[in-house]
Amino acid sequence: MASILIVDDSRTSRKILKGILESEGYEVVGEATNGQEGYDRYVELKPDVVTMDITMPVLDGIEALKKIKGEYPDAKVVMVTAAGQKTKMVEAVQNGANEFVSKPFESEQLKKIIDKVVG
């Protein structure tokens, strides 16, 4: 099953994502609390997929996405964000996001998106 890095500044969101992903059989190999830490963990771990929140301190999700995709164009990144951030989602896709999911989401919806991205 795919290895996944969760990048989100909310401890609650990370816990929920981890629970859903592990219950679906994915291996959560790491977590990060901001975009810079997410980039650093990506370089260290090279997971199959990154789930990336958009609004975070230090380096937001869009900037972290640009940084990861700039150096690792084949990286698979799924943006996870609050509903109502359509402009940010368009910006994320324009900068290489493979997919996105809006909170709140169902576990089956997330699984379908991860499976699609992993191929």
Regions found by a protein language model. Name each.
Residues 34-37, 60-63:
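Acidic catalytic/metal-coordinating carboxylates
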Residues 11-30:
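Two-component/phosphorelay signaling modules centered on CheY-like receiver
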Residues 43-45, 67-75, 95:
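Conserved phosphotransfer cores of two-component systems
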Residues 56:
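Receiver (REC) domain active-site loop signature in two-component systems and cognate sites
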Residues 15, 63, 84-99, 112:
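Alpha4 helix (beta4-alpha4-beta5 surface) of REC/receiver domains from two-component response regulators
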Residues 105-114:
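C-terminal output helix
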Residues 45-51:
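Active-site beta3 strand of CheY-like receiver
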